[in-house]
Amino acid sequence: MIGNWNYGTGRRKSAVARVFIKSGKGDIVVNGKPIKEYFARETSLMIVRQPLELTEHAETFDIKVNVTGGGETGQAGAVRHGITRALIDYDATLKSALSKAGYVTRDAREVERKKVGFHKARRRKQFSKR
C-alpha cells in the first residue's frame, strides 16, 4: 500500500503494467488515457475487467495504470495481472476466488527464439531429396 493506493505489478509476454487502485467510482486510466480510448478492441477491455467483475468491484475502485512494452493483447493481460495483484493487496480474502479463475498465475508463455538454420523458431528450410 502506497498512501491510500494499493499497488500491483502485472506481466504478460514482454509487457509490464504498474497498477494503482483506490476507492472511487470505477474510472480506469491507462497511460493517461481512459481505458476505452487506450484499448481499441472489445476483447482487450473484457480481459482487463475480468478480475473486477469476478470480485464484484467494477464500480468500487479508481484504477491508474502505467504499462510499457508488448502489443495490445500482452498489455491487456499485464493490466489484468496487475489489477489482480492490487486487489489481493487490498483484500487478501479475494485471493482464493481470483486464483481459482486463474488470474493470479502469471502466464509464462513467451515468444520462442529463432534458431540458426531455420526460417523462424520452428520452420525449417525446405528439404530437397535431389
Swiss-Prot record:
It comes from the Bacteria. Keywords: Ribonucleoprotein, Ribosomal protein. This is Small ribosomal subunit protein uS9. InterPro entries: Ribosomal_Su5_D2-typ_SF (IPR020568), Ribosomal_uS9 (IPR000754), Ribosomal_uS9_bac/plastid (IPR023035), Ribosomal_uS9_CS (IPR020574), Ribsml_uS5_D2-typ_fold_subgr (IPR014721). Belongs to the universal ribosomal protein uS9 family. Pfam families: Ribosomal_S9. The keyword Nucleotidyltransferase does not apply. GO terms for molecular function: RNA binding; structural constituent of ribosome. GO terms for biological process: translation. HAMAP family: Ribosomal_uS9_B (MF_00532_B). NCBIfam families: PRK00132.1. It comes from Cupriavidus pinatubonensis (strain JMP 134 / LMG 1197). One of its GO terms (cellular component) is cytosolic small ribosomal subunit. The gene is rpsI.
